[in-house]
Regions:
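Positively charged n-region of N-terminal signal peptides that target proteins for export
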Residues: 1-4
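Bacterial N-terminal signal peptides
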Residues: 6-16
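Boundary at the C-terminal end of the N-terminal hydrophobic targeting segment
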Residues: 18-22
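Acidic/histidine-rich, surface-exposed loop or edge segments in extracytoplasmic proteins
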Residues: 23-38, 121-124
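Divalent metal-coordination and catalytic microenvironments
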Residues: 42, 71, 125, 162
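A non-catalytic alpha/beta surface segment that caps or lines the substrate-entry region
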Residues: 43-89
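Sec-exported extracytoplasmic/periplasmic mature domains
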Residues: 51, 55-58, 141-150
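Surface-exposed loop and adjacent secondary-structure segments within mature catalytic domains
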Residues: 66, 75-81, 91-97, 107-117, ...
């Protein structure tokens, strides 16, 4: 009986740990699918979702890049292959050197271009009443975080995507008003 109880306990704990590591879908977090009629995510909900994604996915790194006028955190969710996220400083240095292009030879620039990664900036929510922007942003982060098809793997292996929330105050204001 004791062996059975121990086995059952280990099985339940293992399942709990696996479930805890699962990336939550927007529907499971917000209570609706992104794009559902008459449903808007607040910034407070979005912030909590970003934190969950960063906690459970090795493909997401969350950074606070400043404060808004109303004192909210402004986030950048960096999405890429985990090996790229582990070497962010290296790729940042390469990008900065190539952007400034000072005192580097053509050979050095070519080598850095071959070694570096494409950096893509995607922001959402700039104009608060244009609510599709921030919601597609949330869905895009989710899709890049959870999809495991060859095309997504290729994109994440070669690209560092900077998802920046452009207007947290506006999202909170409009979604609460709505």
């Amino acid at each position: 009986m004791r062996k059975y109880f121990c086995f059952l306990l280990i099985a339940l704990l293992s399942q709990s740990l696996l479930m805890a590591q699962t990336v939550p879908s927007p529907k499971s977090h917000f209570g609706f699918n992104i794009g559902d009629n008459y449903q808007l995510a607040t910034f407070t909900q979005t912030e909590a979702y970003l934190k969950k994604l960063a906690a459970v996915s090795k493909k997401v790194k969350l950074q606070v890049i400043g404060k808004t006028e109303e004192g909210r955190n402004q986030y950048m969710a960096i999405v890429s292959d985990p090996s790229n996220l582990a070497n962010l400083e290296k790729y940042k240095t390469i990008s900065q050197k190539l952007a400034h292009a000072e005192n580097i030879s053509v050979a050095e620039a070519t080598q850095m271009a071959n070694e570096g990664k494409a950096v893509v900036w995607i922001d959402g929510g700039l104009h608060a009443t244009e609510v599709v922007g921030i919601h597609q942003w949330i869905e895009s982060i989710y899709q890049f975080t959870t999809r495991n098809d060859e095309e997504t793997k290729r994109i994440l292996a070669n690209t560092i995507i900077l998802f920046v929330h452009a207007n947290p105050d506006g999202q909170e204001l409009v979604s609460n008003w709505y």
